[in-house]
Amino acid sequence: MFKTLYARIAIYSITVILFSALISFVLTNVYYHYNLKASNDAKIMKTLKEARQYEQSAKPTHIQQYFKHLGQMNYQIMTVDQKGHKTFYGEPFREDTLSQNAINNVLNNKDYHGIKDKPFALFVTGFFDNVTDNTVGINFKTKDGSIAVFMRPDIGETFSEFRTFLAVLLMLLLFISISLVIASTYSIIRPVKKLKLATERLIDGDFETPIKQTRKDEIGTLQYHFNKMRESLGQVDQMRQHFVQNVSHEIKTPLTHIHHLLSELQQTSDNTLRQQYINDIYTITTQLSGLTTELLLLSELDNHQHLLFDDKIQVDQLIKDIIRHEQFAADEKSLIILADLESINFLGNQRLLHQALSNLLINAIKYTDVGGAIDIALQHSHNNIIFTISNDGSPISPQAEARLFERFYKVSKHDNSNGLGLAITKSIIELHHGTIQFTQSNEYVTTFTITLPNNSL
C-alpha cells in the first residue's frame, strides 16, 4: 500500500480529513454537553410548563387529544398515570429508558430534568439521543388525577429536511475533498516521477536529456538543481573519458616506441646503436615513471580529504631550495634567475607547495630562450601572499592560454611533457585556498601569479 509516494500522500491526506471530522464531532459533543445542554433543558421545560398552564386555563375536554396535538407539533411525549400506564404521543421513542424513580418523583410533583442531567457519552450526542430519559417532565392535574408528562422535541421531524441537506453536504464534502486530495497528490507526484525517470537515464549514462522546470516551488528548485547536477555529471563524464583517452595515449605511444627499440636492439650487433637504443629506452621509461608519479599525485589531489595543511613553511627558504635544485638546468641554457624574496611564513602542506612552485620554475627554464632571464618575486600585499615568476620566450596564442591549466593539454604537439604540471599546480594552489593566473605582455614576457591567504597572522 505504501510502496509509492502517491499512495502514501493520498492515504495520509484522507486519514487527516476523516480524523479531523471525528475530532470535530467529539469537540462539538463536548461543547454541547458543557455549554448548551442546560439551556436546552430549560427551554423545553419552559415550553412544557406553558403547555400545562394552557391546559389548566383552557381545560380541554379530552387531554389525550391535547397531547396528540402537541405530538403533531414535532414533540415526543410520554404520559404515565398513577397506575403506571404509559401513553406515547408523536413519533415513538427509540427506547424507553426512564427509571421508575424518576416517574415517581414527577408524580409527587417534582420536576424532572433528564436533558440537563444526561450523562456525557463521547460518541453519542445528547441533543439527538431519542430515549425517554433524555426528556423533561412535570406533573399535570387532570380530572382522573395526576399524571407524569415527559416531553422532548422531535429532532428527527424538526430537522428532517436539514438532516438530508446536511448528509448530502457532508457526502459531497468528503467526495470532493478526497477527489481533490487525489488530484493534488498526483500533481505533486508527477514531477517526482519524471525526476525518477531522469535519474534512471542518468544511471544509464544519458547526461544530455534535461527535465523541464515546470514549477516555482521546492519541486521546481529540485528540478533546477537536478539539471545542474546532470550538467556537472556530464562534464565529469566527459573529463573522465578524455582522461582515459589521454592516459591511454600517453602510455601507448612510449610503449610502442619501446617495443620498436627493443626489436631494433635484438636485430643489431652494432654496439654504438645498441647503446643508443638502451639510452632511448631509459629515457622513455623515465618519462613513463614521471607520468605515473604525476597521475598518482593527481589522484591524491582529487581525493584530498586525508591531506593535512598544518606545516609551518618558510616560503622564501622553500623557493631558494627549489632554485638551488634547478640551478644546473638553468646553467645549461645560460639563464639568469633573479629572485626578490621577502621573509614570509605560511601554514600549508610543504610537500605539495614545493611541487607546485617547482613545476612553475621547471616550466620557466624549459620555455625561456637561451641566455634569457627568469624573475621571481615573493611579497606581502594586504592580507595576501603574492608569488610571481616571469620569463621571456615564445608567445602563447589566446586559444592555448585558455587551456593552459587543462589536464594533458600541451601548447605544442612536439612537447615531450605529459601536460599535467600546470593542472597539478592549479589543484595544489586551490587546495591552499589560493588562485593562480597567467598573463602575457606584448614583449612576450609570460607571468604566473599565485595569490595565497596570509594565514600566518
UniProtKB/Swiss-Prot annotation:
What is the enzyme's class at the highest EC level? Answer: transferase
InterPro entries reported for this sequence? Bact_Sensor_His_Kinase, HAMP_dom, HATPase_C_sf, His_kinase_dom, HisK_dim/P_dom, HisK_dim/P_sf, Sig_transdc_His_kin-like_C
HAMP domain: residues covered: 186-238
- Phosphohistidine-modified residues are H249
Q: How is it modified after translation?
A: Autophosphorylated.
Q: What is its EC number?
A: 2.7.13.3
Q: Reply yes or no: does the keyword Iron apply.
A: no
Kindly name one Pfam family recorded for this protein. HisKA
Reactions performed catalytically: ATP + protein L-histidine = ADP + protein N-phospho-L-histidine
> Which Gene3D superfamilies does this one have?
1.10.287.130, 6.10.340.10, Histidine kinase-like ATPase, C-terminal domain
**Where found in the cell?**
Cell membrane
Q: Which CDD domains does its entry note?
A: HAMP (cd06225), HisKA (cd00082)
**Every Histidine kinase domain range:** 246-456
Output the superkingdom of the source species.
Bacteria
Report keywords, A-Z: ATP-binding, Cell membrane, Kinase, Membrane, Nucleotide-binding, Phosphoprotein, Transferase, Transmembrane, Transmembrane helix, Two-component regulatory system, Virulence
Report how it sits in the membrane: Multi-pass membrane protein
Any transmembrane segments, and where?
Answer: 9-29, 164-184
An MF annotation (GO) of this entry: ATP binding
Kindly list the GO CC terms recorded for this protein: plasma membrane
Q: What does this protein do?
A: Member of the two-component regulatory system HssS/HssR involved in intracellular heme homeostasis and tempering of staphylococcal virulence. HssS functions as a heme sensor histidine kinase which is autophosphorylated at a histidine residue and transfers its phosphate group to an aspartate residue of HssR. HssR/HssS activates the expression of hrtAB, an efflux pump, in response to extracellular heme, hemin, hemoglobin or blood.
This protein is called Heme sensor protein HssS
- Native species of this protein? Staphylococcus aureus (strain MSSA476)
